[in-house]
């Protein structure tokens, strides 16, 4: 029998077809176009017919590339970057071509870009500025073409052959417009059936216009005039963005699919996906010569004869000459003027701008000046072309040219808040006002020759304007008594013009031609005008002026900025007609309108500076020369010189300097903060001046030019009437008539020491002789005298005792004589240095007061004559008047180096002293700050270890109650307000206190290292009200009682709150003291019915009441461990008692003559207390109550007292809690056996190790507790499942690794994979038998009972399923006969099929390995953002029928894929859920194509009934757990409140918005809106009254950056 012929080779053909299908080998095709597209982070090229998922990066590392175009002939690629607000370019045909900036200023949101390849121009749209602009390809000659009637212009396309440009506008009135490329013949061509026209492109061959509408989901086309509109694609688009075409194919990008698609340009057929899984596809172009055909234009030859721009036009002669923005075209129609002539200069907070007033577009151009922080005022010099401005944040005055070059800082010292600025363009001077220093000052225009013109009676000076022709200046003051003032340009002849009906007169402008003065008031909301002499006041405008700030005048118009409207407007000064120049520009400050080419007016200062060497001032009377600070005018009245010596004197709130030679040089030193200056001295080596202020009770210093004012002593002064500088030892001495002390400190106020405090009676004037080592002073007490002592305060000796009230003691160092004025005899006397040889120098004086000596003269002041005079120092003859008309000159001196000459030991290395070097006759002695101890060997000083601290209302003082030290010294602690309680840490040497603002603070005793432990301003519990505090020095903790919450709290000394240790419903703990040595705290409990004294362990346990009777109001407690006693004082019973620490042996210690006791403490053998009413600190012996002594009297407003004793390091180390807090995490308590016991605050529990405190258990037994983070508990099944659910990923830590042949149990156990779903629990948690009704492995059969058995066990005649279902429905057939020819003939094809299947499997495996490797990430085969969409399926199992959609279509790689959750602008690209998957939605409610693009979400968003945060049956467990049935692995989205709309008021000064990169999450609550991708609201507002609406946010999110709009303004949201 003939063998059967071989069958057809169809297995091999099938194999070939499968290989082609699997590996995607393309068939030969014609050349396909290259697509150039922006992908936000980069710009790419892709071959439209090439291999899928392959693209070439043209340029990477971009911020936010949006629009893109090219110039094919040059290989140039252009794109816009909306984050960098720039247009940039690079080249395709150059290796390593650099990115170049084309336009980098004046852009906000450049959405559209088009290249005119013929005319070599760039056109672009800006949807924020609402402009369409054009420039050369290199960005030069930039011009605004359209600025009106634009709302949200986006895409732009050019047709150079016909001279037309087209653009889309998706604002309030969506439309497509056409205009000539020169800006002519503008016309709307499409305005119906249009909503969000995104993409736009032109078919140059068929002369068709294509556009895409993202809202209406279609692509249409029409003729270029808008006629014959046709549908191309409709209804099946998700979110098309940009379009382009090539041949018969139309290409577009889609935001939602993140892909590039294509179809037939006429029918919409042949739809296909070109490239997918893009980051964020934006604009797209076909990169080919056909898209940019070349032809000749008239602009090719000599630029069309144009000086700047030659723009193509649709009308004869088919081109137009144009000028850069703001520049006018001359009458010849070809040449542009040199530049803008009338310009508006604008200061914004962080930039300067210029606006041309020559052209109607009013485009603002940013000056390229760096480091502008907070520009306020601005002005211009038309001669040199400099722009001047003030910066309030950097505290400087700067200037630069109009193009931004030549930036300089002119003034940056002694300037606080420079609000106004004005240029005297004639005299070349610069004036400014400063609301911080309350001055008006002037310099030359280059910043030299600075001089203060006005410094008195200024409150809040702001605007300033100059009239150089009349020699006048005008300024506004918006302080408590607002006014407008006028003075000569030199500051003289000051007068008030307007002081009625003013609020905040911010702006000021002069009309030089008309002689008018205009101002704008931000409080009365008016613009008013008067004549320059103050007459004929009238209102020009008072409608809709919410907050005027900047103000200027040019020609017939007044211009102003408005803070609230965010606009620049102008009004005609005669007609009062009004225009808006710029709308919705935030951060507007000052402005100046100028004619840059026109100089108006002159005066004599224009001619060689009026002959002045420095400053020239033209005044209504004459030209006056002025000198800068530190120089004097010579008798020629023109030349300024540096004087050899000069007089300095104090006069109440000012310190002046005058010439020794002439009487016309009285100059106030520009010092700030002087109230009532008294004593005066100087340090010539450092050019410092020192003065005392008896009103402020301070000693201050500054440089002689008035700069760097600082307080050197500001605590513990009462009436510092005398003061002298030790210029050799660099020390400062002063006498205080209030405290009856003479003190010394370093010149900076450090190391303060009380020198003399005994036997003083109103010390007054001081004089020093450092060369000899003596100090001299006068006393005005009951027995006035003149005294001498060593400069260390020792060896006091009365020199003159028969004298009246001697004042202003002065030493003639050359002749060794003392001089003084006697206020009782009205004489000036002199003696030798021992008080002998007394001589009367002058005795016919009405009322001499201040006195100084220099050279051969003495100088004195006379209160009755209001003068300063001089006379011969020996005879009193040759009296000369130096200065008259002076009131209450307190002190006077001559500033000259001869007054501070000589040598002593302290001049060299401070005499080797650690702190103070004090000169004495024949040598020196080292000294220390009060209470410090000198080490004689090292000459260093040691701080006190045993002392008392007591607090007053606004001071804390230190006291050492012995005879060797000065008793008390106020510590330099700043900001003390109503101190209530104090304590001290002897280890770190910090003082702790409670103040009246509910703060607990600390600082070193020298005021350094201040720190706030707890404060309401830190956002802590607003109910906190600390009452008392006590420190545990061993555990480094602070215990404090709270009046508001009635608790005892504990803080670490580092500032960390530990929690509450004691609380009760009826408890009111107040006074507290910690006895850490024995592990107890004692406190008073001021319960409603009866006061108590209680004791408890440091953790609040072991609580016991010691006393409930014999108490009314115990206010202070103190423990003495030496005696084992507890002491307390009762303010109402007015007695001090004691008892044993256990409460036994109660004893009254003192109850006589106690009026208002507050504090109590123990130091050594004595018990100290304070009595607020008697203003005393007293003490008794602590054991007997005997020897009651008053320690300090006349101490007002006492509030607390605390004793500090030296801590024994041996005893400290022996404490069980001293080392590492006894090993405890929180509270360490010393036990009686010397071992520590750890405990916790009430909100925590002690864990099993008995050392650490932790949260109480809140998770159920079948849950896993996260270590930290906002999620507390997760289901136990999620532990070690490969996906971190805890914020800190602690659920995936410490997990065992199971092999591929093992099944990982939920709790980490590994079992044989074959035991999965075998009907028996092999995992300890039974997780191997969970979900068996839904899942079996690919080689398993699912039984009806849910059990899984091997497929080969099915129908094997042996029941393997529990219910025997594996043996049901089996057909029992007889094995075929071996000799059957029919069956024999089928063996070959069967073998071929089997071989084919094996080969296909191998190819599939290879393809999977190759393709999947493309997406391998650091964390596994896929990046982190792609997560499994089927959480119940094993990780190596592909769900049946589970088609793989999304960005990796057709690629499974062993996992079912789903796009990650996106946060709008995040990396995922899709919203959390869409409208078609909202809770309760019917499955048939929508036929959106989203269902085919992404796998369905398994569960809807949580509802109130299912969300465990709203309903939880496990009521005793934490509700902070995610839902057990999860639609996807949770990417926890933190709650974020919507940003506030910066609706400003009249005092609003903050217009900043959140960064566009950081404000994406708050849109999530809008995801379920019926319009899932609405555009952001337009920022442009109509001309509305501020009373009706708030101005919109100054910066909205990019329209394509976030797909959702910001929440509505709270002012306009009707909901």
Curated annotation (Swiss-Prot):
GO biological process: one example: osteoblast development
Region spans: Disordered: 1475-1501, 1568-1615
Location(s), subcellular: Membrane; Endoplasmic reticulum
Segments for region (Beta-propeller 1): 32-288
SMART domains in alphabetical order: EGF (SM00181), LDLa (SM00192), LY (SM00135)
Tissue: Widely expressed, with the highest level of expression in the liver and in aorta.
Repeat region (LDL-receptor class B), residues: 75-119, 120-162, 163-206, 207-247, 248-290, 385-427, 428-470, 471-514, 515-557, 558-600, 687-729, 730-772, 773-815, 816-855, 856-898, 989-1035, 1036-1078, 1079-1123, 1124-1164, 1165-1207
Cytoplasmic side: 1408-1615
Outcome of substituting residue 404 to R: In OPPG; appears to traffic less well than does the wild-type protein; appears to be post-translationally modified similar to wild-type protein; has 50% of wild-type activity to transduce Wnt signal; has a significantly reduced ability to transduce Norrin signal
Effect on the protein upon substituting residue 244 to M: In OPPG; appears to traffic less well than does the wild-type protein; appears to be post-translationally modified similar to wild-type protein; is unable to transduce Wnt signal; has a significantly reduced ability to transduce Norrin signal
Effect of residue 560 to C: Found in a family affected by polycystic kidney and liver disease; uncertain significance; the patients carried additional PKD1 variants; the mutation results in significantly reduced WNT3A-induced signaling pathway
Record protein name field: Low-density lipoprotein receptor-related protein 5
Keywords linked to the UniProt accession: Developmental protein, Disease variant, Disulfide bond, EGF-like domain, Endocytosis, Endoplasmic reticulum, Glycoprotein, Membrane, Osteogenesis imperfecta, Osteopetrosis, Osteoporosis, Phosphoprotein, Receptor, Repeat, Signal, Transmembrane, Transmembrane helix, Wnt signaling pathway
Short motif (PPPSP motif E): ranges: 1605-1612
Origin species: Homo sapiens (Human)
Mutagenesis / variant outcome for changing residue 816 to P: Likely benign; no effect on Norrin signal transduction
Taxon lineage: Eukaryota, Metazoa, Chordata, Craniata, Vertebrata
């Amino acid at each position: 029998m003939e063998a059967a012929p071989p069958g057809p080779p169809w297995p091999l053909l099938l194999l070939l077809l499968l290989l082609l299908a699997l590996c995607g080998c393309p068939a030969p095709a014609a050349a396909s176009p290259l697509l150039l597209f922006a992908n936000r982070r980069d710009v790419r090229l892709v071959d439209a017919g090439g291999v899928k998922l392959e693209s070439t990066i043209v340029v990477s590392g971009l911020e936010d590339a949006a629009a893109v175009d090219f110039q094919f002939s040059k290989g140039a690629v252009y794109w816009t970057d909306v984050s960098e607000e720039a247009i940039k370019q690079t080249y395709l045909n150059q290796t390593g071509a650099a990115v170049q900036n084309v336009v980098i200023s004046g852009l906000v949101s450049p959405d559209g870009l088009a290249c005119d390849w013929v005319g070599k121009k760039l056109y672009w749209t800006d949807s924020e500025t609402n402009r369409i602009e054009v420039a050369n390809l290199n960005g030069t000659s930039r011009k605004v073409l359209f600025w009106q009637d634009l709302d949200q212009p986006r895409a732009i396309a050019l047709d150079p052959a016909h001279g037309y440009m087209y653009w889309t506008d998706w604002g309030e009135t969506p439309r497509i417009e056409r205009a000539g490329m020169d800006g002519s013949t503008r016309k709307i061509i499409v305005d119906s059936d249009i909503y969000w026209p995104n993409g736009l492109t032109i078919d140059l061959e068929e002369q068709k216009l294509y556009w895409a509408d993202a809202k209406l989901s279609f692509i249409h086309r029409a003729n270029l005039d808008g006629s014959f509109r046709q549908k191309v694609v409709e209804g099946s688009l998700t979110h098309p963005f940009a379009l382009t075409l090539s041949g018969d194919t139309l290409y577009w990008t889609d935001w939602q699919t993140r892909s590039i698609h294509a179809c037939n340009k006429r029918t919409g057929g042949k739809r296909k996906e070109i490239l997918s899984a893009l980051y964020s596809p934006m604009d797209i172009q076909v990169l080919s010569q056909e898209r940019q055909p070349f032809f000749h234009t008239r602009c090719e030859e000599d630029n069309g004869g144009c000086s700047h721009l030659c723009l193509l036009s649709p009308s004869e002669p088919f081109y137009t000459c144009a000028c850069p923005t703001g520049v006018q075209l001359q009458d010849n129609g070809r040449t542009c003027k040199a530049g803008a002539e009338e310009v508006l200069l604008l200061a914004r907070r962080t930039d300067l701008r210029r606006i041309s007033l020559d052209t109607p577009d009013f485009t603002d151009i940013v000056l390229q000046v760096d480091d502008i922080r907070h520009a306020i005022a601005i002005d211009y010099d038309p001669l040199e072309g400099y722009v001047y401005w003030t910066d309030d944040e950097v505290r400087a005055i700067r200037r630069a040219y109009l193009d931004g070059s030549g930036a300089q800082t002119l003034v940056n010292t002694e300037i606080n808040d420079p609000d106004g600025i004005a240029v005297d363009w004639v005299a070349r001077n610069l004036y400014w006002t400063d609301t911080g220093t309350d001055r008006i000052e002037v310099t030359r225009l280059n910043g030299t020759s600075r001089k203060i013109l006005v410094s008195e009676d200024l409150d809040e000076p702001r605007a300033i304007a100059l009239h150089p022709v009349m020699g006048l200046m005008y300024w506004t003051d918006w302080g408590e008594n607002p006014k407008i003032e006028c003075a000569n340009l030199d500051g003289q002849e000051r007068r008030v013009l307007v002081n009625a009906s003013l609020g905040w007169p911010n702006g000021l402008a002069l009309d030089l031609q008309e002689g008018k003065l205009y101002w704008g008031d931000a409080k009365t909301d008016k613009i008013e005008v008067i004549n320059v002499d103050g007459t004929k006041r009238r209102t020009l405008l008072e409608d809709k002026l919410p907050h005027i700030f900047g103000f200027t005048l040019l020609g017939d118009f007044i211009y102003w900025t408005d803070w609230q409207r965010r606009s620049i407007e102008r009004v005609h000064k005669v007609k009062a007609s009004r225009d808006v120049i710029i709308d919705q520009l935030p951060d507007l400050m000052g402005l100046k309108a100028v004619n840059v080419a026109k100089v108006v007016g002159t005066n004599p200062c224009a001619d060689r500076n009026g002959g002045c060497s420095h400053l020239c001032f033209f005044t209504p009377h004459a030209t006056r020369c002025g000198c800068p600070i530190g120089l004097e005018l010579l008798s020629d009245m023109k030349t300024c010189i540096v004087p050899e010596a000069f007089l300095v004197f104090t006069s109440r709130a000012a310190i002046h300097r005058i010439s020794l030679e002439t009487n016309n040089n009285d100059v106030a030193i520009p010092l700030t903060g002087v109230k009532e200056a008294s004593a005066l001295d100087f340090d010539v080596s450092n050019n410092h001046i020192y003065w005392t202020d008896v009103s402020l009770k301070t000693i201050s210093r500054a440089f002689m030019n008035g700069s760097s004012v600082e307080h050197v002593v500001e605590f513990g002064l009462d009436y510092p009437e005398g003061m002298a500088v030790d210029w050799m030892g660099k020390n400062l001495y002063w006498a205080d008539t209030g405290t009856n002390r003479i003190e010394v400190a370093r010149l900076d106020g450090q190391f303060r020491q009380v020198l003399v405090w005994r036997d003083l009676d109103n010390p007054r004037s001081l004089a020093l002789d450092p060369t000899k080592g003596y100090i001299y002073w006068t006393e005005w007490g009951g027995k006035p005298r003149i005294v001498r002592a060593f400069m260390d305060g020792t060896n006091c000796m009365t020199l003159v005792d028969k004298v009246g009230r001697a004042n202003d003691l002065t030493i003639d160092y050359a002749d060794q004589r003392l001089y003084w004025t006697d206020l009782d005899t009205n004489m000036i006397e002199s003696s030798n240095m021992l008080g002998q040889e007394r001589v009367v120098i002058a005795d016919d004086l009405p009322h001499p007061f201040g006195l100084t000596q220099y050279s051969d003269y003495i100088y004195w002041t006379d209160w009755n004559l209001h003068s300063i005079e001089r006379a011969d120092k020996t005879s009193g003859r040759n009296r000369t008047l130096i200065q008259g008309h002076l009131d209450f000159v307190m002190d006077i001196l001559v500033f000259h180096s001869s007054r501070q000459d000589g040598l002593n030991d302290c001049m060299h290395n401070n005499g080797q002293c650690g702190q103070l070097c004090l000169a004495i006759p024949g040598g020196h002695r080292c000294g220390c700050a009060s209470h410090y101890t000198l080490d004689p060997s090292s000459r260093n000083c040691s701080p006190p270890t045993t002392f008392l601290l007591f607090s007053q209302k606004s001071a804390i003082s230190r006291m050492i109650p012995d005879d060797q030290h000065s008793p008390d010294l106020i510590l330099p602690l700043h900001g003390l307000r109503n101190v209530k309680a104090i304590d001290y840490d002897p280890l770190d040497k910090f003082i702790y206190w409670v103040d009246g603002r509910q703060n607990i603070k600390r600082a070193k005793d020298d005021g350094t290292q201040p720190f706030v432990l707890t404060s309401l301003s830190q956002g802590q519990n607003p109910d906190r009200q600390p009452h008392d505090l006590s420190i545990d020095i061993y555990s480094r903790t602070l215990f404090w009682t709270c009046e508001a919450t009635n608790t005892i709290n504990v803080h670490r000394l580092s500032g960390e709150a530990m929690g509450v240790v004691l609380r009760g419903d009826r408890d009111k703990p107040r006074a507290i003291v910690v006895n850490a040595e024995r592990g107890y705290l004692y406190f008073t409990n001021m319960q409603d019915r009866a006061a108590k004294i209680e004791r408890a362990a440091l953790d609040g346990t072991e609580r016991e009441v010691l006393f409930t009777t014999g108490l009314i109001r115990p206010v202070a407690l103190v423990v003495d461990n030496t005696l084992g006693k507890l002491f307390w004082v009762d303010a109402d019973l007015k007695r001090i008692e004691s008892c044993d620490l256990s409460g036994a042996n109660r004893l009254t210690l003192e109850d006589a003559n106690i009026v208002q006791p507050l504090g109590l403490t123990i130091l050594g053998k004595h018990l100290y207390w304070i009595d607020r009413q008697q203003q005393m600190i007293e003490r008794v012996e602590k054991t007997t109550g005997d020897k009651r002594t008053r320690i300090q009297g006349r101490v007002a407003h006492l509030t607390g007292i605390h004793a500090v004793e030296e801590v024994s390091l041996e005893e400290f180390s022996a404490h069980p809690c001293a080392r590492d807090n006894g090993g405890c995490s929180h509270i360490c308590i010393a036990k009686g056996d010397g071992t520590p016991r750890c405990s916790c605050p009430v909100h925590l529990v002690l864990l099993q190790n008995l050392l650490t405190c932790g949260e109480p258990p809140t998770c159920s037994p079948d849950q896993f507790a996260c270590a930290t983070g906002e999620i507390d508990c997760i289901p136990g099944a999620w532990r070690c499942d490969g996906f971190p659910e805890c914020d800190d990923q602690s659920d995936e830590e410490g997990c065992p690794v199971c092999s591929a042949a093992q099944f990982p149990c939920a709790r980490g156990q590994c079992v044989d994979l074959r035991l999965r779903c075998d009907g028996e629990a092999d995992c300890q948690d039974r997780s191997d038998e969970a979900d068996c009704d839904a899942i079996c492995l690919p080689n398993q059969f699912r039984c009806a009972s849910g059990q899984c058995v091997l497929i080969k066990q099915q129908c094997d005649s042996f029941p393997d399923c529990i219910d025997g279902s594996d043996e049901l429905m089996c057909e029992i057939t007889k094995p075929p006969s071996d000799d059957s020819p029919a069956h024999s003939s089928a063996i070959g094809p069967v073998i071929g099929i089997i071989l084919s299947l094996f080969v296909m499997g191998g190819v599939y495996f290879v393809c999977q390995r190759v393709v999947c490797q493309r997406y391998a990430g650091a964390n596994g085969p896929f990046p982190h953002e792609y997560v499994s969409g089927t959480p119940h399926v094993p990780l190596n199992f592909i769900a049946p029928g589970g088609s793989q959609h999304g960005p990796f279509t057709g690629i499974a790689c062993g996992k079912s894929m789903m796009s990650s959750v996106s946060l709008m602008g995040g990396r995922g690209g899709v919203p959390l859920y869409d409208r078609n998957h909202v809770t309760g939605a019917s499955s048939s409610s929508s036929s959106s194509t989203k269902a085919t693009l992404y796998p369905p979400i398994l569960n809807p968003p949580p509802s109130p009934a299912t969300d465990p945060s709203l309903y939880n049956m496990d009521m005793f467990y934490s509700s902070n757990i995610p839902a057990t049935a999860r639609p996807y692995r949770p990417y926890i989205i933190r709650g974020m409140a919507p940003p506030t709309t910066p609706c400003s008021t009249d005092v609003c000064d903050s217009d900043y918005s959140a960064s566009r990169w950081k404000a994406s999450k708050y849109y999530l609550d809008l995801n379920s809106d019926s319009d899932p991708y609405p555009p952001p609201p337009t920022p442009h507002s109509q001309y509305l009254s501020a009373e009706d609406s708030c101005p919109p946010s100054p910066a909205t999110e990019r329209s394509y950056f976030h797909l959702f709009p910001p929440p509505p303004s709270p002012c306009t949201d009707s909901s």
